[in-house]
């Protein structure tokens, strides 16, 4: 089993000289979990993007180690599964076609037709696999994001607003994903929901919210 560790050291992010957050530090390894909490506008999604390598910090550093080897942040994407509001699927493709196309991004992983089938079944979309995503409800689109995020059994699963647009059945699906990830990999959850924060052992609070 691949082991991953992440060290975030005094990370600060500024936009137009305005500080979004300052001096965020934490460390995680496989089998550990972290909730990123804070009021709206405190920078939770921004921090998630930095952790994923989609944004660079203004100051501070991130260090990933995979199986005792240092990995550049840009290369960590192969080890990450991400679910977030800013991750978009292809409306002009079917649900199945989305996973087939997106699986090519994971070309270094053995993603077979059977793996894609299981992913769609696990999120309850198998019966709608041949429907265009533009006909999906917002909750179904969120489920499809989970299917893609879990497709390659990521060592690091990052969830930003994890139960957005989901009904009770969808939330139960998310909780199964969280339980599976917690048993074998690293889990990071960015949320305003106190219940979702309890999925994680550690917590980073952004903004003026108190621990």
Predicted feature descriptions by range:
Residues 60-71, 75-76:
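Conserved ABC transporter NBD signature motif
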Residues 52:
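Helix-to-loop junction immediately C-terminal to a conserved catalytic motif
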Residues 157-161:
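Catalytic Walker B motif of ABC-type/P-loop ATPase nucleotide-binding domains
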Residues 6, 21-23:
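Conserved structural motif at the start of ABC-family nucleotide-binding domains
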Residues 100, 104, 111-128:
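Conserved ABC ATPase "signature" region
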Residues 37-39:
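The feature captures the beta-strand-to-loop junction immediately N-terminal to the Walker
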Residues 86, 92-107:
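Q-loop/switch helix immediately C-terminal to the Walker
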């Amino acid at each position: 089993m691949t082991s991953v560790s992440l060290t975030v050291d005094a990370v600060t992010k500024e936009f137009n000289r305005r500080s979004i957050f300052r001096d965020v530090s934490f460390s995680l390894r496989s089998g550990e979990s972290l909730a990123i909490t804070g009021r709206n506008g405190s920078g939770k999604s921004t921090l998630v993007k930095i952790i994923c390598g989609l944004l660079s910090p203004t100051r501070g550093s991130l260090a990933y180690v995979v199986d005792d080897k240092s990995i550049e942040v840009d290369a960590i994407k192969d080890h990450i599964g991400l679910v977030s509001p800013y991750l978009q699927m292809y409306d002009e493709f079917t649900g199945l076609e989305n996973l087939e196309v997106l699986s090519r991004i994971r070309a270094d992983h053995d993603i077979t037709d059977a793996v894609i089938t299981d992913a769609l079944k696990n999120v309850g979309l198998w019966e709608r696999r041949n429907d265009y995503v533009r006909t999906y409800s917002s909750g179904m689109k969120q489920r499809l994001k989970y299917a893609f995020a879990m497709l390659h059994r990521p060592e690091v699963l990052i969830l930003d607003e994890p139960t957005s647009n989901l009904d009770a059945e969808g939330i139960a699906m998310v909780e199964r994903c969280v339980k599976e990830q917690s048993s074998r990999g690293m889990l990071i959850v960015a949320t305003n929901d106190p219940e979702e924060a309890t999925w994680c052992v550690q917590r980073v609070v952004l903004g003026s919210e108190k621990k």
